[in-house]
Amino acid sequence: MYARCGRPSIAPEKLLRAQLLQMLYSVRSERLLMEEIDYSMLYRWFVGLYLDEEVWDATSFTKNRDRLLEADVAKKFLKCVVERARNAGLTSEEHFTVDGTLLEAWASLKSFQPKNQKAKTPPDDSGNPTVDFHGKRRSNDTHISSSDPDAKLARKGPGKEAKLSYSGNLLVENRNGLIVNAELLEANGRAERDAALLMLEQVPGTKRVTAGVLTRDTIRLNSLRSVVISELHRTWPETKARRGGSAIDARTVHHPGYLLSQRRRKRIEECFGWLKDTAMLRKLKHRELFRVG
């Protein structure tokens, strides 16, 4: 009645533990991860495999990824970790830092083609076609990536190289530098501001929340909506002051708590550095916002 060649079922928590190992120890692929779990007693113990138990096939991650995404397991996993830290008194519910970074999409600039482009002749090289886009004006309004339609052409600042990217945003509490929330949005120029408001809405408690925001765009947002943010989100902006005028009054700038907050803001950059270098998220391994996020 049942096939004899089928694979045994895998508990979702074991898949999550294995993927956590992949990020913590910078394992570049899931196939290599299975090889290392096979001969590492430490990895087997952490994942929950006996010494004589066979490891899974690397395609098990691919086949189960959609199920994990549909149930939003990664978000729930982070929420449980944050809740345990909060119960242990390791997090603050008052002082936070919000910032965003660009994560390079798994798509090349050659795939960034005009939206209304008509069918062309076959390329000279199907594996790596020649595309001459120098001197041509390209924007997200007129072009779209054929490899990853959700990726947007963006750059972090003036003079920086523009790449197909997503906007990764973090909410970090300042007391211990723990990540308490994360949002991935399209890099559309408003992502950091939208993500900041979205994550601050989810901060528990009734106390007033202070949020240090690092970007110039969000500073302009705070100058226009500081009253709205304070009333609706129990949030008071502690943005970095600018020369030639700032949205922050002098009383806030000279307060000892503000100076301490400015020194703690660097911790969110350390989180971004770990995610990009150790967890290997500098260049994403999946496509489409639903899968990447």
Segments (PLM) and residue ranges:
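Structural motif
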Residues: 5-13, 161, 263, 287-293
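Short alpha-helix plus adjacent loop in nuclease-associated cores
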Residues: 6, 65-69, 262
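Phosphate-backbone recognition surface of nucleic-acid-processing proteins
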Residues: 44-62, 242-259
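Helix-centered, glycine/charged polyanion-binding patches within enzymatic domains
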Residues: 117-121, 130-134, 138, 216-293
